[in-house]
Amino acid sequence: MSLPRNPQKPLLSAENWTTAAPAHHVTLLTKDGCHLCADARTVVRAACQDTGSEFSEVDITTDAALLRDYANFIPVVFVDGIPWDQLRIDERRLRDVLS
């Protein structure tokens, strides 16, 4: 639960509390020329938009450590900073975890 939105209303008023869970943050690791990355981008963007989750994309070629660690495994999806899926992204599973 969050803090009351309107302190003028009684605390037990249904209008005074929000119950929505915070949106997740999804990060997609990609690189140019990766056809699986293009497919994953479509899936991840749609799932994030439909669930109200934040989406960001990181090109692994801009960071030597990411390139070293993930060059053979992209695309990689992180949900809330935790590695979640790689290569062919399962849209149904992603939507389930973001719901």
Predicted features along the sequence, with ranges:
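N-terminal leader/targeting and pre-domain segments
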Residues: S2-T18
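Local sequence-structure signature of Cys/Sec-based thiol-disulfide redox active-site neighborhoods
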Residues: E15-A47
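Conserved strand-to-helix beginnings and helix N-cap segments that scaffold or border functional pockets
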Residues: A38-R41, L67, E91
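Conserved helix-turn-beta segment immediately C-terminal to the redox Cys motif
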Residues: R41-D59
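Short acidic active-site motifs
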Residues: T62-L66
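Non-catalytic, surface beta->alpha helical segment in thiol-disulfide oxidoreductase systems
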Residues: G81-S99
